[in-house]
Design a protein with these regions (language model features):
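Short glycine-rich or small-residue beta-strand-to-loop segments that form or flank ligand, phosphate
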Residues: 10-20, 76-78, 111-115
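A short, basic/flexible loop-to-alpha-helix module at the beginning of a structural domain
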Residues: 1-8, 98-103
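Glycine-rich oxoanion-binding loops at beta->alpha junctions
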Residues: 55-113, 120
Length: 142
């Protein structure tokens, strides 16, 4: 909702794939825009990319988390590689990765998930979109 409304918005954010410059700057830009647009926004940061979304490893970000990171390389959330071709393959515990990510998304009542990642990350983002999740995907490469 626009400024002045009382509804809480929850937006998820993750960085995936290889680490590179500008991830922090991009996250900061997205967060800054969200904080300007909405009075009551909560940004949920997933640790280590899709892995954090799969295993519900997250933290509620504060505005101060995005301060001082503009010129810092890498990502304050961490990143990991989760091969797209294995997203539908259960892990060693039998966990269906896509179902686990959907479960976390809905459990946390996210309105949208912002994904910063390369080619494989974009394929996974599209897979989640096909599953009905609201995705904003920002491509990057090393």
């Amino acid at each position: 909702m626009k400024k002045g409304t009382a509804l809480m918005r929850r937006i998820g954010m993750l960085t995936s794939g290889g680490d590179c410059q500008s991830l922090n700057a991009t996250m900061r830009g997205v967060a800054k825009s969200l904080y300007k647009m909405f009075d009551d926004i909560e940004i949920v940061g997933f640790e280590d990319g899709y892995k954090g979304l799969m295993y519900a490893d997250y933290r509620i970000m504060k505005q101060s988390d995005f301060s001082g990171i503009l010129t810092r390389g890498g990502t304050i959330l961490g990143t990991s590689r989760q091969p797209f071709k294995l997203m539908r393959t259960p892990d060693e515990n039998g966990l269906d990765k896509v179902e686990a990510m959907k479960h976390t998304y809905y459990k946390l009542k996210l309105e949208c998930l912002v994904i910063l990642g390369g080619n494989g990350s974009q394929k996974t983002a599209n897979l989640l979109r096909e599953e009905g999740l609201n995705i904003v995907s920002l491509p990057k490469t090393i």
